[in-house]
Amino acid sequence: MGEPQGSMRILVTGGSGLVGKAIQKVVADGAGLPGEDWVFVSSKDADLTDTAQTRALFEKVQPTHVIHLAAMVGGLFRNIKYNLDFWRKNVHMNDNVLHSAFEVGARKVVSCLSTCIFPDKTTYPIDETMIHNGPPHNSNFGYSYAKRMIDVQNRAYFQQYGCTFTAVIPTNVFGPHDNFNIEDGHVLPGLIHKVHLAKSSGSALTVWGTGNPRRQFIYSLDLAQLFIWVLREYNEVEPIILSVGEEDEVSIKEAAEAVVEAMDFHGEVTFDTTKSDGQFKKTASNSKLRTYLPDFRFTPFKQAVKETCAWFTDNYEQARK
């Protein structure tokens, strides 16, 4: 009681992951404002698939604002195998977080979606209006539908209670504290780990697939700044895509070259074309973001890759891999 009118207590779920750690760093480096109290929690603090534990956490923290990053995630092959688990765990977690936020009277919730939720058959570039236009890719339908339901639930909280519960849709995020597991991580951290191993063993680097698919990569520290902007300034319930522009899309081959350059690797680079390429592209439009923030400057891709490679090398023992 007696808190000044502008004060905010922000609870960040999934606080130990890639994006959570980036928000923590950006806040510590000066993005936090006076009157803001940031609380970062991870699965060690509460099992968010458990309603009672989630409610107890929210009762204890009493957040005015929530950034919901926690999710059960995995690479392509784990998704294919465990679609039911990805659906159930994420649906339980999301419902528990959103409803606990509602029950403690949180003024705003910003959840994190993913571009994989978009319809498999679509036109490009993808934009925020297309989320529910058709089924997602069959490989990870459990995860994708669970994430889509956050948007459905946000709209229902707004319609029934006027809540400002919204969501952001980042493209391919990378940066320090990523999961650098080669089998189960995403493409860029997997490449960084592979180059590190090839360099230390003096062997060739093998990139899976043709190297032709194209992706929009966003640096986790840029995404963290945008998350904080959304939390403070973005008041729509409709989601917003957080991404570099369409012109900044890079091929997997170009991404591999950036990692090779950043890590000063001089060995042979080969492409294993027996491995699947996945979707050729998932180009997303950031024109909605640009109408709000025309001057936001993203970290240049090569610089962000360099910083991430340096972090991985310096923290090799502790890094998730």
Swiss-Prot record:
CDD domains: GDP_FS_SDR_e. Belongs to the NAD(P)-dependent epimerase/dehydratase family. Fucose synthase subfamily. Homodimer. The record marks S114, C116 as: Important for catalytic activity. Its EC number is 1.1.1.271. The gene is GFUS. One of its GO terms (cellular component) is extracellular exosome. Catalyzes the two-step NADP-dependent conversion of GDP-4-dehydro-6-deoxy-D-mannose to GDP-fucose, involving an epimerase and a reductase reaction. NADP(+) binds at G14, G15, S16, G17, L18, V19, G20, K147, P170, T171, N172, V173, H186. Pathway: Nucleotide-sugar biosynthesis; GDP-L-fucose biosynthesis via de novo pathway; GDP-L-fucose from GDP-alpha-D-mannose: step 2/2. It comes from Homo sapiens. It is an enzyme of class 1 (oxidoreductase). The record marks K147 as: Lowers pKa of active site Tyr. Keywords: Isomerase, Multifunctional enzyme, NADP, Oxidoreductase. Signal peptide: none annotated. One of its GO terms (molecular function) is identical protein binding. The active site is at Y143 (proton donor/acceptor). It comes from the Eukaryota. This is GDP-L-fucose synthase.
